């Protein structure tokens, strides 16, 4: 398969998808098919697939570089889980392929919606409705979407976030959409939800994307931040109910009139919110796909970092819950140009929030081949298209390491976190050794080649080492998925756009097969077995449910911590938790945020490595209260800490 840049410096967008007859997923010609069955057409010369055996062998040969435990494995247990969800992409990125932002996919979120101690999964979808799957225990799930009332089948959904909006002890749900109106659902505590969007006044109609809850003014009620990408659609409706994308959608960043700025809603209590964006001076520019929060300057107030899908990101400092001030130049003089995923976490166990950002769009400038996927992108676009000097940007992932003086050093290449076509990522201690690891969901699907998901093991803060083949995340069980069916003999669109290369030399019905790819992910202990598992939301395909066998391979020690605020918000969003054990000090933040459109951070999980005991646990609450526990806890259990 030959691919060309999604964006072009010239005035046209060029895409190509080249096939070679009916093929198997290995690239070899298949035997003749029945005349009554559609031909399956796989991309030809897919270097992403062809290189998998060699990449696996090469990675396994590097095992001796790992100082941490790696002799465990992830297995995709989708079938055993009972989950039958399938992501359905809208027509804009399938049969009538257009280069627009619909190909960015949707998120996934986790919460215990019914209070039974098991974490349930909410899959976000474009066409056909979202789905809520109840955790039955032992790795099994049941679809409860209908009785829960959270399907939203007639909207194009994008992101999701759970939070206890009214401090009732039950996680409520917020979902963003593309021009369908965002939705807030109230949870009755038993996993049944009621749409309270109208009274909450949060039903913005826009091209919304990521969202998260946080208490920006520390009044004990969680507020809501919503990112909006910008106008990339026309008023024409497609067959899936979506608004058809603009032909120059990826030039939208050059049209300020198309911008749709982020919105900050202040929680007034009792499911009522107020738009205070202008009041607090928040006005970041650009196409914001997602954002996250952390107390970057250590003054006790949560700040915000906004991603820009095409251009410079921005950091806004919280001044006492009254105003936000743009401090980007002071802290982050260069940022990724095509940012997609974001997460604050302490990768070096130094007690300070470091920042990882994935950059997918820079990888669309040109295809480097698999040997160069760990390098920054060689940008071919003009500076007029970039809307800035090349020297102003980082063209790839960025890992900002916070130093003792509060400044940040960009160390992505030094730390080995560059990946290819990355979307969202999730962070968690996958081998329970006290060092947070990274799972990166990636790939581009039709009409591009196969791209791998990445799993980066934290080598004790010294470097992240590629481990997706070592640990069984790659290669996938199924490398391709059906994308769309077309009748090459009768369909009037058969020789239009990418369909022309699909139907070239063919007659009758043809199914175009696409490389599989992931857009978002969550990390949590889905079976309460003590080890962290991974669930993905794959684009136009089924999810992957990666179950870890770590607990069966070695004796592991861990503690999970859930917070109960009193003066602070009920879930303790914004709290800082420090666990000291075995000479290692781990710091995590209750931010309720995963890497892209998603959420997987409740409860906090601390791997304890070989520590014989936990020495102390310290909680810094959003209210300003500090709490130190030096007894009353044990390993391998869930600990609930209530604010004094």
Language-model-detected regions and their locations in the chain:
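Blade-edge motifs of beta-propeller repeat domains
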Residues: 25-103, 134-155, 186-206, 237-286, ...
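Long hydrophobic segments that form regular secondary structure
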Residues: 401-411, 416-436, 440, 501-505, ...
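Bacterial N-terminal signal peptides
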Residues: 8-17
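Gly/Ser/Thr/Pro-enriched helix-cap/hinge segments flanking short amphipathic alpha-helices
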Residues: 23, 72, 91, 95, ...
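Beta-rich catalytic cores
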Residues: 104, 128, 156, 180, ...
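Structural signal for beta-propeller blades
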Residues: 129-132, 181-184, 233, 262-264, ...
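Hydrophobic beta-strand segments that make up the repeating blades of beta-propeller
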Residues: 74, 118-125, 170-177, 224-228, ...
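Beta-propeller blade termini
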Residues: 105-115, 134, 157-170, 186, ...
């Amino acid at each position: 398969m030959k691919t060309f840049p999604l964006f072009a410096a010239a005035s046209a967008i060029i895409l190509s998808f080249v096939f070679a007859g009916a093929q198997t997923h290995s690239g070899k010609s298949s035997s003749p098919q029945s005349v009554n069955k559609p031909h399956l057409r796989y991309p030809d010369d897919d270097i992403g697939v062809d290189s998998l055996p060699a990449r696996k062998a090469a990675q396994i040969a590097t095992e001796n570089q790992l100082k941490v435990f790696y002799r465990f494995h992830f297995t995709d247990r989708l079938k055993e889980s009972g989950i039958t969800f399938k992501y359905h992409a809208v027509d804009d990125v399938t049969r009538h392929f257009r280069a627009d932002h619909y190909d960015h996919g949707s998120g996934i979120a986790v919460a215990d919606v019914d209070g039974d101690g098991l974490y349930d999964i909410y899959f976000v979808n474009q066409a056909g409705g979202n789905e809520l799957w109840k955790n039955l225990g032992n790795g099994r799930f049941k679809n409860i979407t209908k009785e829960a009332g959270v399907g939203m089948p007639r909207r194009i959904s994008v992101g999701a976030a759970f939070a206890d909006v009214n401090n009732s002890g039950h996680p409520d749900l917020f979902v963003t959409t593309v021009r369908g109106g965002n939705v807030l659902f109230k949870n009755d505590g038993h996993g049944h939800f009621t749409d309270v969007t109208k009274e909450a006044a949060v039903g913005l109609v826009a091209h919304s994307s990521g969202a998260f809850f946080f208490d920006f003014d520390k009044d004990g009620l969680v507020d809501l931040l919503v990112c909006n990408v910008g106008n990339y659609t026309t008023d024409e409706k497609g067959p899936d109910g979506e608004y058809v994308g603009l032909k120059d959608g990826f030039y939208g960043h050059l049209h300020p009139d198309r911008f749709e700025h982020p919105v900050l809603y202040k929680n007034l209590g009792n499911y009522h919110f107020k738009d205070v964006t202008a009041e607090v001076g928040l006005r970041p520019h650009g196409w914001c796909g997602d954002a996250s929060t952390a107390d970057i300057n250590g003054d006790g107030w949560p700040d915000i970092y906004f991603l820009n899908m095409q251009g410079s990101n921005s950091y806004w400092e919280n001044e006492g819950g009254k105003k936000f001030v743009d401090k980007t130049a002071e802290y982050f003089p260069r940022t990724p140009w095509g940012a997609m995923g974001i997460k604050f976490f302490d990768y070096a166990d130094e007690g300070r929030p470091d920042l990882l950002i994935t950059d997918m769009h820079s990888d669309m400038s040109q295809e480097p081949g698999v040997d160069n996927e760990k390098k920054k992108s060689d940008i071919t676009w003009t500076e007029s298209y970039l809307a800035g000097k090349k020297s102003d940007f980082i063209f790839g992932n960025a890992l900002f390491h916070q130093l003792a003086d509060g400044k940040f050093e960009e160390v992505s290449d030094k730390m080995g976190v560059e990946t290819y076509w990355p979307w969202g990522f999730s962070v968690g201690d996958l081998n329970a050794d006290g060092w947070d690891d990274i799972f990166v969901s990636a790939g581009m699907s039709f009409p591009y080649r196969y791209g791998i998901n990445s799993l980066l093991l934290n080598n004790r803060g010294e470097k992240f080492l590629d481990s997706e083949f070592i640990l069984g995340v790659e290669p996938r069980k199924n490398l391709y998925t059906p994308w769309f069916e077309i009748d090459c003999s009768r369909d009037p669109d058969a020789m239009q756009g990418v369909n022309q290369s699909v139907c070239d030399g063919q007659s009758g019905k043809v199914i175009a097969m696409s490389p599989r790819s992931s857009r978002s992910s969550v990390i949590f202990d889905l079976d309460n077995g003590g080890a962290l598992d991974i669930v993905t939301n794959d684009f136009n395909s089924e999810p992957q449910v990666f179950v870890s066998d770590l607990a069966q391979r070695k004796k592991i020690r861990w503690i999970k911590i859930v917070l109960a605020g009193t003066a602070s918000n009920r879930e303790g969003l914004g709290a800082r938790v420090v666990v000291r054990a075995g000479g290692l000090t781990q710091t995590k933040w209750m931010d309720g945020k995963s890497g892209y459109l998603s959420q997987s951070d409740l409860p906090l999980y601390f791997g304890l490595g070989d520590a014989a005991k936990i020495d102390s646990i310290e909680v810094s609450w959003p209210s300003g209260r500090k709490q130190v526990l030096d007894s009353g806890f044990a390993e391998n259990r869930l600990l609930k800490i209530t604010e004094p």
